[in-house]
Amino acid sequence: MEQRIVCWFSCGAASAVATKLAIAENAGRLPLVVARCIVREEHDDNERFAADCERWLGVPITNLINAKYDGSIYKVFHKESYISGVYGAPCTRLLKKEVRHKFEKMTDRHVFGYCAEEQGRWDNFLDANNINAVSPLIERGLEHSDCLAMVRDSGIELPMMYLLNYKHNNCRGCCKATGPGYWNKVRVDFPDYFSRMANESRRLGVKIIRIGGDRVFLDELEPGTGNYQDEPEIQCGIFCEMAKHELEAA
């Protein structure tokens, strides 16, 4: 079976840059697929960002979805009666990991957008997954701020979640987040999503928020508490410049 390269595009800046680097490095030698797992609760602007990236990458994006749950975290919560906890988040497992497993082939070489500051997470991922996988960003010492800058410098407007000063382009109200500052920001930016998660977590008895050593329900969170990080710093360092030159020379 012929090997192919599968770049996992998540509508985040890191996965976009990792995919761009992988395409340049491959230079058409092996079949290459850019795959995206659809999650309904991500920001609608992701469709615009994906279309912009598709033109930048020069490769069509293959959209994948878990039809059983229509790609929705809330349908996962409803059917699984579980949001998150010691066993992780079922939405990640069912809407992303399971979809990836169904799509992948034994001979695939996978490309992921782990950044240089995520070396520990990358090592854990490799330990937990018996697959042929590479991280172009770690190989080049590229951090998340470098990726934000490279996307911006390519002329593509960053996804709305970044422009709203979120650290990553996750769902509007990520169930894996436990910080009061994060959820109070979601309360302001996406009140409907805050209320929906508050209702669902109360229904399932899940205390999402962590304050000190205590857990509290989302609907018990006092407005204004917590401190979420300000706007991400967007600047291109030396490794970023080296990677940009690599792309320009490709």
Predicted regions mapped to residue ranges:
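Nucleotide-activated chemistry modules centered on ATP-dependent adenylation/adenylyltransferase
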Residues: 1-250
